[in-house]
């Protein structure tokens, strides 16, 4: 039977609850416990699939095709465990489920209310994750901040949850901020005291406090927090600002987070094996020469819009013992000026996914520059589509070559809408989503990198390579190195006579892990490093 840990946040938003939950998951897994992590998001969207990246950051896609919060990416990367659509819950999805049940008559004519129906649905979702995953411990992160109106149903639900299970099967962790007041030279505990008071007023007494701070928390402050907040002294956990999110599990282990959590859950504190994780941190803190990577995107004002891409690059650099020198390049600025101006001194170019016309010509210009100047290049999703358009326009010289998404009247739509998408009107959850197989062709870079005949990658797209032009591309020197098993969909393309030029329709960044970088990103960094060494 599963045990349950609930992670709440206080004082300010974006305090790092997701990293704390993911780090605890890593620590528990290193002790031999199986873990699943669930995110409860208080917004009314059914999922983040239709939200602007500027509003929400990236949309993380699970194996079973759910469009979820980026925190699920942290959960997967830290625990190396695949999450499912059950691991992402929003207020919108809860209300949708309850209203659908009411329409079906499932409540036998009763008045549908927040309590017990909404809170009951939330509790049911948590139990469902436990039964589906068979995890020893289910960690649930509650989005938002204690005191927010929109979070109240979730907080009430996790209060009620303690009545569903045995007393020692539930633990509450509260992540909070201890601000440092520069003028007085003091760390203030009052905001945390008020946050815990607010949590208690709901009926939740936290078992552990994880205290974010940029200054060390002395024993006197810990005793003060212990006394005012009713938390065991050993359960006041210091969480100092870290040089990398990947060092957080080691810091929290030192502070005893996992040990105290297991004590609260009445579970054995088994021997901890973090040797591989410590090696990752060692390589991260002792990098070799820098690799200057340009990420050419349209949402670069918010780095979280490309979070998994950046982490995948970082994983590859850690494994290759290189320093990631990441340069954010606006595709629109390239349109205004030139690719040469922004990319003349980079070692690699990555063009990630996206939607719509804005910045596309800048991406295409970047790809042309990478192709002609022999700069290692990796295109992802829309990045592959732009690579196809670039080749069609500048090498094959097809008049008006484009994508039917970008130009519905194009006389040469080398990228077109998937046939099964033609009658779909709704936007949310209707793309080609989740894991699909891809068969790799012999004697290709793709086959060499993966060393597999069939791979499984995650997708999120409506448009695809137009097979009407396949032979034209092959005859002109393009290699189609990966397709769907039936050969109908082009999944991976590459160029010969180039140090590294690959583009894929899928999202390989979602499968990259610290210590296990994705082959395409590993290949990109390796090719960049080798090209640098040859130029010396």
Curated annotation (Swiss-Prot):
Binding residue positions for Mg(2+): 71, 141
Q: How is its activity regulated?
A: Allosterically activated by GTP, when glutamine is the substrate; GTP has no effect on the reaction when ammonia is the substrate. The allosteric effector GTP functions by stabilizing the protein conformation that binds the tetrahedral intermediate(s) formed during glutamine hydrolysis. Inhibited by the product CTP, via allosteric rather than competitive inhibition.
SUPFAM superfamilies in the cross-refs = Class I glutamine amidotransferase-like, P-loop containing nucleoside triphosphate hydrolases
Traced from the root, the source organism's taxonomic lineage reads:
Bacteria, Bacillati, Cyanobacteriota, Cyanophyceae, Synechococcales
How does this chain assemble?
Answer: Homotetramer.
As for family, the record states: Belongs to the CTP synthase family.
Record's signal peptide? none
Kindly list the positions annotated as binding L-glutamine.
354, 382-385, 405, 462
The record lists UTP as bound by: 13, 188-193, 224
| Function (record text) | Catalyzes the ATP-dependent amination of UTP to CTP with either L-glutamine or ammonia as the source of nitrogen. Regulates intracellular CTP levels through interactions with the four ribonucleotide triphosphates.
Q: Please name the top-level EC class of this enzyme.
A: ligase
Q: Where does ATP bind?
A: 14-19, 71
**Reactions accelerated catalytically:** UTP + L-glutamine + ATP + H2O = CTP + L-glutamate + ADP + phosphate + 2 H(+); L-glutamine + H2O = L-glutamate + NH4(+); UTP + NH4(+) + ATP = CTP + ADP + phosphate + 2 H(+)
> What does the further note read?
CTPSs have evolved a hybrid strategy for distinguishing between UTP and CTP. The overlapping regions of the product feedback inhibitory and substrate sites recognize a common feature in both compounds, the triphosphate moiety. To differentiate isosteric substrate and product pyrimidine rings, an additional pocket far from the expected kinase/ligase catalytic site, specifically recognizes the cytosine and ribose portions of the product inhibitor.
Q: Which UniProt keywords apply?
A: ATP-binding, Glutamine amidotransferase, Ligase, Magnesium, Metal-binding, Nucleotide-binding, Pyrimidine biosynthesis
Q: Which GO terms describe its molecular function?
A: ATP binding; CTP synthase activity; glutaminase activity; identical protein binding; metal ion binding
All copies of the Glutamine amidotransferase type-1 domain together span: 292-534
Which Gene Ontology BP terms does the record give? 'de novo' CTP biosynthetic process; pyrimidine nucleobase biosynthetic process
Q: What protein does this entry describe?
A: CTP synthase
Pathway(s) where this gene product acts:
Pyrimidine metabolism; CTP biosynthesis via de novo pathway; CTP from UDP: step 2/2
State its Enzyme Commission number(s). Answer: 6.3.4.2
Whose protein is this, by species? Answer: Prochlorococcus marinus (strain MIT 9515)
């Amino acid at each position: 039977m599963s045990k349950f840990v609930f992670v709440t946040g206080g004082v300010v938003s974006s305090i790092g609850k997701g990293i704390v939950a993911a780090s605890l998951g890593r620590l528990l897994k290193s002790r031999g416990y199986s873990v699943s992590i669930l995110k409860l998001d208080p917004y009314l969207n059914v999922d983040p699939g239709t939200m602007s990246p500027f509003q929400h950051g990236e949309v993380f896609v699970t194996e079973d095709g759910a469009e979820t919060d980026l925190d699920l990416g942290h959960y997967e990367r830290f625990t190396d465990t695949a999450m499912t659509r059950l691991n992402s819950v929003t207020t919108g999805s809860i209300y949708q489920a309850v209203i659908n049940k009411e329409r079906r008559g499932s409540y036998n004519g009763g008045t549908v209310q927040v309590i017990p129906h909404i809170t009951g649905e939330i509790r049911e979702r948590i139990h469902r994750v436990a039964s589906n995953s068979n995890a020893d411990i289910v960690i649930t992160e509650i989005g938002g901040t204690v005191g927010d109106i929109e979070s109240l149903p979730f907080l009430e639900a996790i209060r009620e949850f303690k009545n569903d299970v045995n007393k020692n099967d539930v633990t509450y962790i509260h992540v909070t901020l201890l601000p440092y007041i520069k003028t007085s030279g003091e760390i203030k505990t009052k905001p945390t005291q008020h946050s815990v008071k607010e949590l208690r007023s709901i009926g939740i007494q936290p078992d552990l406090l994880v205290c974010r701070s940029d200054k060390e928390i002395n024993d006197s402050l810990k005793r003060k927090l212990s006394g005012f907040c009713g938390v065991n002294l050993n359960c006041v956990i210091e969480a100092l600002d870290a040089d990398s999110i990947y060092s957080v599990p080691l810091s929290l282990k030192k502070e005893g987070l996992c040990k105290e959590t297991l004590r609260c859950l009445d579970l054995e504190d088994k021997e901890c094996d973090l040797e591989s994780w410590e090696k990752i941190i060692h390589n991260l803190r002792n990098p070799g020469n820098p690799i200057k990577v340009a990420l050419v995107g349209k949402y670069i004002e918010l780095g979280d819009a490309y979070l998994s891409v950046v982490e995948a690059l970082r994983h590859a650099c850690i494994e290759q013992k290189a320093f990631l020198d990441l340069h954010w390049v606006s595709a629109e600025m390239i349109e205004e000026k030139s690719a040469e101006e922004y990319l003349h001194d980079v070692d690699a170019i990555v063009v990630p996914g996206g939607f719509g016309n804005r910045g596309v010509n800048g991406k295409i210009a970047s790809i042309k520059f990478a192709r002609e100047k022999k700069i290692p290049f990796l295109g992802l999703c829309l990045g592959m589509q732009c690579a196809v358009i670039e080749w069609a326009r500048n090498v094959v010289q097809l008049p008006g070559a484009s994508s039917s998404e970008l130009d519905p009247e194009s006389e040469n739509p080398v990228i077109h809408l998937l046939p099964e998408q033609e009658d779909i009107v709704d936007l949310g959850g209707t793309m080609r989503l989740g894991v699909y197989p891809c068969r790799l062709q012999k004697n290709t870079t793709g086959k060499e990198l993966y060393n597999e005949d069939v791979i499984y990658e995650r997708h999120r797209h409506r448009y695809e390579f137009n097979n009407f032009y396949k032979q034209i591309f092959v005859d002109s020197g393009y290699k189609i190195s990966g397709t769907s098993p039936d050969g109908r969909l082009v999944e991976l393309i590459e160029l010969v006579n180039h140090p590294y030029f690959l583009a894929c329709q899928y999202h390989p960044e979602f499968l990259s892990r610290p210590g296990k970088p994705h082959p395409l990103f590993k290949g990109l960094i390796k090719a960049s490093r080798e090209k640098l060494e040859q130029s010396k």
